[in-house]
C-alpha cells in the first residue's frame, strides 16, 4: 500500500545533497568560531585601552562624576585602569560565550533538519514502517468515501509527517530508530561514538541558550560540541545509507 510514494532515485539525490551540506556547514561554523576567537584575542589590548580611556572620561566629566562617588578607584592615580581592564575581560568573555552559544544553536537546528531529511529518505525507500507508525490513528469513513482508502491514508500520513517537525531532537532520533528497526549506536564514521547522554546534554544546552538561562560557555567547549553534532549527522546518514543500500547521485540540472 502506498508504494507509489517510494522513490529511491530521489532518495539518492538527497543523500548526496545531505552529505555535501553536512561537510560544508561544519567547516564554515567551526572555522568562523576560530576566526572570531583569534580576532578577539588580537583586539583585546586595544579594546582595553579604549575602555580605560572611556572610564577615565566618565569619571572626570561633571555630568557623570557623581556616579563614581565613593569608588575605591580614582581617575587621578591610575587605579581605574585595573578596573577597566577587568571589565573589558568580562565583556569580551561574555561576547565569546554569546558567539559560542549561537554556533551551537545553529548546529543543533541543522542536525534537526538533517534528521527530518533522513526520515524523508526512509519513506522514499520503504513506506511500510511509516504505515505501522500511524496504524493506531483513525481515518474517517467520510474521507475514505470521498477519496478512497489509499488517498485517505496518505493524507493521514502527511499530517503525521508535518507534526514531526514540532518534535524535539531526541524524539526525531527515536522515530528514525523505530523506522530503521536496528541499533543506532554504531556506524562507519571514524573516531565517533554515539552518546545519547551527550546529545541530551547538548539539547538541554540549546534550550538554555534559547531562553538566556546560561551564559558561561567557552569557544573551546562549543567547538567540541559542534563537531560532535555534525559527526552525529554523518553517523545517522551512514546508518540510513547502509540500511537501504543507497548510493549517492547528482540531481540533474
Question: Where would I find each of the regions flagged by the language model?
Answer:
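Charged alpha-helical initiation segments
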Residues: 1-102
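Polyanionic, low-complexity intrinsically disordered segments
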Residues: 1-31, 191-253
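Intrinsic-disorder-associated interaction segments
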Residues: 4-15, 22, 29, 41-48, ...
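Residue-level detector of alpha-helical secondary structure
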Residues: 6, 37, 44, 158-161, ...
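Low-complexity, compositionally biased segments
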Residues: 10, 29, 48, 54, ...
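Short, surface-exposed, charged/polar-biased interaction segments
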Residues: 26, 33-36, 40-43, 50, ...
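Helix-loop junctions and short alpha-helical segments
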Residues: 62-200
Amino acid at each position: 500500500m502506498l508504494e507509489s510514494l517510494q522513490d529511491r532515485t530521489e532518495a539518492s539525490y538527497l543523500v548526496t545533497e545531505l552529505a555535501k551540506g553536512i561537510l560544508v556547514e561544519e567547516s564554515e561554523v567551526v572555522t568562523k568560531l576560530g576566526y572570531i576567537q583569534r580576532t578577539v584575542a588580537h583586539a583585546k589590548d586595544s579594546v582595553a585601552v579604549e575602555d580605560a580611556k572611556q572610564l577615565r572620561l566618565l569619571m572626570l566629566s561633571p555630568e557623570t562624576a557623581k556616579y563614581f562617588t565613593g569608588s575605591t578607584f580614582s581617575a587621578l592615580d591610575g587605579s581605574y585602569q585595573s578596573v577597566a581592564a577587568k571589565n573589558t575581560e568580562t565583556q569580551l568573555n561574555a561576547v565569546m560565550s554569546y558567539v559560542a552559544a549561537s554556533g551551537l544553536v545553529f548546529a543543533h537546528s541543522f542536525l534537526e533538519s538533517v534528521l527530518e531529511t533522513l526520515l524523508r529518505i526512509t519513506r522514499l525507500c520503504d513506506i511500510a514502517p511509516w504505515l505501522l507508525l500511524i496504524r493506531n490513528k483513525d481515518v474517517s469513513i467520510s474521507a475514505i468515501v470521498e477519496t478512497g482508502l489509499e488517498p485517505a491514508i496518505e493524507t493521514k500520513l502527511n499530517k503525521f509527517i508535518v507534526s514531526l517537525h514540532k518534535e524535539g531532537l531526541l524524539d526525531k532520533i527515536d522515530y528514525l530508530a523505530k523506522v530503521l528497526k536496528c541499533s543506532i549506536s554504531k556506524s562507519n564514521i571514524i573516531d565517533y561514538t554515539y552518546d545519547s547522554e551527550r546529545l541530551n546534554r547538548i539539547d538541554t544546552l540549546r534550550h538554555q541558550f534559547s531562553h538566556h538561562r546560561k551564559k558561561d560557555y567557552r569557544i573551546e567547549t562549543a567547538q567540541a560540541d559542534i563537531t560532535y553534532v555534525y559527526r552525529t549527522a554523518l553517523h545517522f546518514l551512514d546508518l540510513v545509507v547502509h540500511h537501504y543500500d543507497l548510493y549517492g547521485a547528482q540531481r540533474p540540472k
